[in-house]
Amino acid sequence: MTLIRRVAFLSLHTSPMEQPGSGDAGGMNVYVRALASALAASGVEVEIFTRSTSSGQPAVEHPDPGVCVHNVISGPPRKLPKEELPELLHSMVAEIERIRQRQPHGRYDLIHSHYWVSGVAGLELSRLWGVPLVHTMHTMAKVKNLLLQSGEKPEPRRREDGELRIVDGATRLIANTPAEAAELVSHYNADFDHIDVAPPGVDLTVFTPAFRPRSRAQLGVPAGKFHLLFAGRIQRLKGPQVLVKAAALLRSRRPDIDLQVTILGALSGAKDFDLKSLISAAGMDDVVTHHPPVNAPELAGWFRSADVVVMPSYSESFGLVALEAQACGTPVVATRVGGLSRAIFDGRTGLLVDGHKAADWADVLEALYDDPATRGDMGRAAALHAQGFGWQRTAAITLESYHAAVDQYIDSHRIPVGHSP
């Protein structure tokens, strides 16, 4: 078995150093940094390449032992819409190669790219360096376009074509769930034998259960409130509008419920999505509070303060928020889509809802309010369920995929045994 010593991560459109829940930063940012750290703890050096978005950024950052982040200078020193990044691909590839040439070691055993822009760059770097490419989609254009919401632009054909090239050219693909692996096969004609399933993890040292009344007191959530929490980017695809409408309906039919809804996150995507106006139109200004995204320890506190975490997403490759909330001992109500069906044990650690009708969501939330004993049982089961999703497990499965990729690459390129690719 070839020893994997050094891996190049490509996360060009968003940095793992960014705060999740704003702009293009979300679960993938958490995934990239946490996986890199877990791999490093297993003895694999990880160097992450991401596009620099500020003239004040250092060239290299060291967030964790064995992990470094290269801020690649390409294009203007500011954040750009994802749609503009393909124009910078050749520039980014050239700059990454210049960085590699300046490194004392000068080589990587493998490339692991994240999201389609990085995957297209990874194809070129794989050819240039003579090493295998492993790719994780995180989201897919064809799947997103099937679930397109009113007012949202479809993913461009250029992205679909890029993803098809990646599926055809990558040595191996890593999916978050069996459902995602099936989507790769059905929508992109991927070879099932070249796909590995590695569920994301959760930081079990940060996201832990705690005494709920204490968490509420620390955040100013009154003891008698039925507290519903949404955490994520503010966009139609994540469904905060579904929660607002369901909460308004619940309030109208059950005025005896002392309701509080907290939304954590920042606007992402369509600029015409006005959450504040939606809240006002629903008559929920006195019930719904909106806060900017917070760091992981603070987020854990918010999860512990909630009676229920609500995820009315239209699409999720996995749904890290669901796992993090459960690790804190809080049940999750989510849409029965994508990876959420795997992240949540329906009926045991939370509930899955079919569709996005406000009445259906209000029914489920009302039933949980009326049954605090079941909420408590679900919370305890949720914390136990999440224990099976540590990042070291994800890293171990990913490392197996890397070894398979190297063996496959050596075999397909007829590299003599004993020589690294």
UniProtKB/Swiss-Prot annotation:
**Which E.C. number(s) belong to this protein?**
2.4.1.250
Give the binding site residues for Mg(2+): 303-304, 306, 330
Q: Which InterPro entries match?
A: Glyco_trans_1 (IPR001296), Glyco_trans_4-like_N (IPR028098), Glycosyltransferase_grp1 (IPR050194), Mycothiol_biosynthesis_MshA (IPR017814)
Q: Spell out the coiled coil positions from the record.
A: none
The UniProt GO MF terms for this protein read: acetylglucosaminyltransferase activity; D-inositol-3-phosphate glycosyltransferase activity; magnesium ion binding
| Residue sites binding 1D-myo-inositol 3-phosphate per the record | 13, 24-29, 82, 115, 139, 159
Question: Where UDP-N-acetyl-alpha-D-glucosamine is bound, by residue?
Answer: 19-20, 27, 233, 238, 294, 316, 324
What UniProt keywords apply to this chain's record, in alphabetical order? Answer: Glycosyltransferase, Magnesium, Metal-binding, Transferase
| SUPFAM superfamilies cross-referenced by the UniProt entry | UDP-Glycosyltransferase/glycogen phosphorylase
Q: Does the keyword Magnesium apply?
A: yes
UniProt catalytic activity: 1D-myo-inositol 3-phosphate + UDP-N-acetyl-alpha-D-glucosamine = 1D-myo-inositol 2-acetamido-2-deoxy-alpha-D-glucopyranoside 3-phosphate + UDP + H(+)
A GO BP term, please? mycothiol biosynthetic process
Transferase: present as a keyword of the record? yes
Note the Pfam families from the entry: Glyco_transf_4, Glycos_transf_1
Assembly and oligomerization: Homodimer.
Under the heading PANTHER family, the entry gives:
SULFOQUINOVOSYL TRANSFERASE SQD2 (PTHR45947:SF3)
Q: Write out the function statement from the record.
A: Catalyzes the transfer of a N-acetyl-glucosamine moiety to 1D-myo-inositol 3-phosphate to produce 1D-myo-inositol 2-acetamido-2-deoxy-glucopyranoside 3-phosphate in the mycothiol biosynthesis pathway.
The UniProt similarity line reads: Belongs to the glycosyltransferase group 1 family. MshA subfamily.
HAMAP family registered for this protein in UniProt: MshA (MF_01695)
**Protein name stated in the entry:** D-inositol 3-phosphate glycosyltransferase
Species of the source:
Arthrobacter sp. (strain FB24)
